[in-house]
């Protein structure tokens, strides 16, 4: 149409203020990091300034400073501080800053509020845990782990009137879980009953679907072949359907679910194919999982079984459970009643108990980690499958107790097991537990001061409560969420006396509360540890101001060499970075394409997704073959100080007993020349 009708023109808008504060605080630090908290003050006027700067920060003592700033120039001010250790050990995990600057000559002012995240260098972890029902006084001998850091940790006791109130050990496990694929974000949001996180997952979910409607663990890259996973899609639809039976808000919206259903139907009918590495043939088993998910929404039909060889005796247990659920929901399957009886008999014949712990006779062959399933998942899903079946009524109490017996350190092994497990025990409790709890539960260690839970004060967190208020000073565990209980926990520090001390717990009143007892300690890794993976780290300067030492502004190349003992799917490599450092290669501002040009990859593993944060570099692999692979990443050191680093870690996400760790020394960064 040309410019005749519209005309042309331009203008420039410049907004500024006479005095500006620009933060140079590292976005993340770790407890006891010694660092230079730096700010830049800018004088945008044509006159010199004499600026007084006053700063306040959580648990830090900061002296006011005065600085002369010539016209049109900037000056840096800084305080040498140590990150308060106690802030890294509570849920708020923040140093809150308030900075005010005033020109004493002209009166110009500026103010800034900033928030630094602070995390533990050696985090508290659960060393041992148990879940028991208090049917009488409980006495156990307890002792802190030999290598535990002094003054940290103790015994956490959480009480629930019934299992339907949730499992504190599982919630704590989810709260600490660091990884972020679609399955993990979904499982965490439901496991924590975090409605806000779930809404974020729902909003992002369409970006994870390929053109066929199948979900990917990470958002597909442009131009990639259709690589959405039928296994992940079936899990998402099945798990959210089960969760929605407890809280309807965790259902997948119809408009998001519809393409996923179409993708699974096309997969089952053979109109699309998905081929992934696996140690054995699994197509029939994957189709059963897809049909089980579809059957929950009335989208499965008997004719869809045509390509599947029906052989429940030869299937892994998770496939038999899928088969039983399909038979119950799909009315037009031939010989339906006979096959339900057959599947029930197969499942009952595989059950056995080691003491109170439930195991399957086929446990070794049931570990299909590449399909995100294992004996824990199978037990939870079996409870859900037979909860309302009269033929299983007499088995339910033993099944639930046997499933609790499979826990290690207060939770199960994987995200999928903890999600299914939490749902299973909540639904079991809602059906079979009715007696209320009243009175008081008291606990003490040795001659130490006792603690108590008064059941008259135990109440639910409300959505109207101030955001974060119930848990900002919590020293360990999951945050409170609406609907969960509060005033139901006790903390007992480790006894001052050496050696074993008796823990005594007793309930007076009505009911039989459930006790989750966790032994919590901070233990630093002192030497490399390999359980399926070995990891070696090499740091090489790319740009270095002073040879042989690290200075602010230096650019470093980090090489991680990983040796894998076996083929494995979905492996993550996680390497921490010093406080204030920047990972290059993001393509964002202040990035350097030149500095990252020398990065190399070697070996048979190629990343499906890379995550760059202020805390760590993480690389996720869909498949890692046996043998050695290497990866590089590049970072810039931005802050002066001495910084602690947690261990470098490699972990198989769905076989977490396969992992490797290597400790990292503190990193000292000096001022540049």
Where in this protein do the model-derived segments appear?
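Long, domain-scale non-catalytic interaction/scaffolding regions in large secretory-pathway
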Residues: 1, 57-59, 75-77, 81, ...
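Short beta-strand and strand-turn-strand segments in soluble, beta-rich domains
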Residues: 5-6, 17-21, 56-64, 71-73, ...
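Short beta-strand edge segments in extracellular beta-sheet folds
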Residues: 12-18, 28-30, 56, 68-70, ...
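Proline-enriched interdomain boundary motifs that mark the N-terminal boundary
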Residues: 19-24, 535
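Short beta-strand segments of immunoglobulin-like
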Residues: 25-30, 66-67, 410, 545-549
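Short edge beta-strand/loop segments characteristic of extracellular beta-sandwich folds
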Residues: 36-44, 559-563
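Extended, solvent-exposed functional surface patches
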Residues: 38, 78, 86-281, 287-292, ...
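Extracellular acidic loop/turn motifs
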Residues: 45-49, 567
